[in-house]
Regions:
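Interhelical loop/hinge segments that connect adjacent transmembrane helices in multipass membrane
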Residues: 19, 24-33, 154-167, 214-219
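Helix-loop junctions and terminal segments of transmembrane helices
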Residues: 1-40, 46, 93-98
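Short alpha-helical transmembrane interface motifs in multi-pass membrane proteins
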Residues: 1-2, 41-45, 74-78, 93, ...
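Interfacial segments at transmembrane-helix termini and the short loops linking adjacent helices
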Residues: 36, 44, 53-84
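Membrane-proximal transmembrane or re-entrant/amphipathic helices at the cytosolic face
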Residues: 176-222
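Helix-terminus/linker motif at the lipid-water interface of multi-pass membrane proteins
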Residues: 1-5, 18-22, 58-68, 126
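Hydrophobic alpha-helical transmembrane segments of multipass membrane transporters and ion channels
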Residues: 40-48, 81, 85, 170-177
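Short runs within selected transmembrane alpha-helices of multi-pass transporters and secretion channels
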Residues: 6, 10-13, 51, 55, ...
Length: 222
């Protein structure tokens, strides 16, 4: 299920990457703007997906896989925490490729492989698949930290508080809605209504800018 959800950032980045690569040849300032917009979009999508998966994990497992997989719910809850970083890491690594920093990506990947192996050796014997899930979360966080560092070094700094504050408040409201309605409504209705709640909050908080609209129009024309 997590792998299926992980397709979302790949689709977003694949749509934006040709623009990003082209802008690097034209202007580093334009590249920075598209990177910052891409980072915002992925944070905007990742937060509700992660929180929704966390809060609805039991219902999702039961609906999709049945009773026999209910024991995997704790693992899905843990892995849902990694989704935020999985989403954002896509753009961090691809933006470095766009500025010809493939070796930097290789260093990051090598570091994360080492971290993941070490964590698996320490955690799996004692905690089993929960330990493996925890190792995945920590590895994605390490990749996120390294990605932010190198993007700040070669392209621009990322103001995470400014980017994530409105989506964070919106997803908190969405999460409250899920908690209050899960026991009363059908799963499909909860997902649809919680998504509407989230994006309504984003609109009310004026998360979207004129530049967002311009980028969207550019993507549609492409």
């Amino acid at each position: 299920l997590v792998e299926l959800i992980g397709v979302i950032p790949a689709l977003v980045v694949s749509a934006l990457f040709p623009i990003v690569s082209g802008l690097h040849k034209e202007s580093i300032d334009s590249l920075r703007k598209v990177y910052q917009a891409s980072f915002r979009y992925l944070i905007m999508i990742a937060l509700p997906v992660a929180v929704g998966t966390l809060l609805l994990s039991g219902h999702l497992i039961y609906t999709i896989y049945g009773d026999e997989y209910v024991k995997t719910v704790p693992a899905l809850k843990i892995l849902s925490l990694a989704l935020i970083f999985i989403f954002v890491n896509y753009i961090l690594m691809n933006i470095l490729v766009a500025v010809n920093r493939q070796m930097t990506n290789a260093i990051m990947a090598g570091t994360c492989v080492f971290v993941n192996i070490a964590l698996n050796v320490c955690l799996i014997p004692r905690y089993g698949y929960l330990g493996a899930g925890t190792a995945t979360v920590i590895t994605e966080i390490v990749l996120f930290i390294l990605g932010l560092y190198y993007v700040a070094k070669y392209i621009c700094k990322t103001n995470i508080v400014a980017v994530a504050s409105k989506p964070f408040i919106s997803v908190a409201i969405m999460g409250t809605f899920i908690v209050l309605t899960t026991a009363r409504l059908n799963l499909a209705f909860v997902i649809i209504l919680s998504a509407l709640t989230y994006f309504t909050c984003l609109l009310l908080f004026r998360f979207f800018t004129k530049e967002d609209k311009m980028i969207l129009i550019h993507l549609i024309r492409k």
